[in-house]
Curated annotation (Swiss-Prot):
InterPro entries: PsdUridine_synth_cat_dom_sf, PsdUridine_synth_TruA, PsdUridine_synth_TruA_a/b_dom, PsdUridine_synth_TruA_C, TruA/RsuA/RluB/E/F_N. Pfam families: PseudoU_synth_1. Belongs to the tRNA pseudouridine synthase TruA family. It comes from Blochmanniella pennsylvanica (strain BPEN). It catalyses: uridine(38/39/40) in tRNA = pseudouridine(38/39/40) in tRNA. PANTHER family: PSEUDOURIDYLATE SYNTHASE, TRNA PSEUDOURIDINE SYNTHASE-LIKE 1. The gene is truA. This is tRNA pseudouridine synthase A. It comes from the Bacteria.
Length: 261
């Protein structure tokens, strides 16, 4: 038996999320069914990040074990043949037995896109958060600096989060404007349930002028979710990259080509 890692891209608009559910379409179930079609094996696929309903991915990483031996191209082409157009396998790699898509990861990176325009977009409404009021990204950038480093992110922790600790380490948070869209690029060692969306919701309150930049620092100190901003919609969130130790030879994401400066 061998262990295989896959790089997955998907439009999460049409799914209940990553995790398999009995009565709703999930990314996991489609991936597992495609594997079964080409190997005749029933496998369980493990992912780096269990994305919510409506959340997208450019750099999801998964792994599974199989007896089937195929070339890298045979895996990608074979699986994509049986996957819907909204899910795609971008690469396949054999990995050693110690690799785990979730527990071997050393960092995760998300991008959140806000369509900051008074007119909504018919094409972008499932891919962004349409926010009409003008957002000052300079204020948002200044506020975001308070989040860097290791902190207790309890104020950005959603109800139902099962993480033992709310301490996380943010490596970077960058905010840029691309035409009518604002891209919030955030990287950390790991994230709690809906943490990115809760951070975005709070930064938007700063950007629209409802709160001063230092309010973000106060939220960190208070450790109280009820004081922070709303949870931003799932539609604007993208899992773009998962990093691993170099000895696993996992390909990097291509996100720089798309949005980030």
């Amino acid at each position: 038996m061998q262990k295989l890692a896959l790089g997955i891209e998907y439009d999460g608009s049409w799914y209940c999320g990553w995790q398999r559910q009995r009565d709703a379409p999930s990314i996991q179930s489609y991936i597992e069914n495609a594997i079964k079609k080409i190997t005749s094996e029933s496998v369980t696929v493990f992912c780096a990040g269990r994305t919510d309903s409506g959340v997208h991915a450019l750099g999801q990483v998964v792994h599974f074990e199989t007896y089937s031996r195929r070339s890298k191209s045979a895996w990608t082409l074979g699986m994509n043949r049986y996957l819907p157009s909204s899910i795609c396998v971008r690469w396949a790699r054999l990995v050693n037995k110690d690799f785990h898509a979730r527990f071997s990861a050393i960092s995760r990176r998300y991008c959140y896109i806000i369509n900051n325009n008074c007119i909504r977009s018919a094409l972008l409404f499932r891919k962004t958060w349409h926010y009409k009021k003008y957002l000052d990204i300079n204020k948002m950038c200044d506020a975001a600096q308070y989040l860097l480093g290791e902190n207790d992110f309890s104020s950005f922790r959603a109800a139902g989060c099962q993480s033992y600790s709310a301490r996380r380490k943010l490596y970077h948070i960058r905010i840029i404007r691309k035409g009518q869209c604002i891209v919030i690029d955030i990287k950390a060692n790991s994230f709690m349930y809906r943490m990115v969306r809760n951070i975005v919701g709070s930064l938007v309150k700063v950007g629209c002028g409802e709160q001063p930049e230092k309010w973000i620092a106060e939220l960190l100190e208070n450790c109280n979710r009820s004081l922070a901003g709303v949870t931003a919609p799932a539609s604007g969130l993208y899992l773009v990259e998962v990093k691993y130790p170099s000895d696993f030879s996992i390909p990097s994401s291509f996100i720089e080509e798309l949005w980030c400066a």
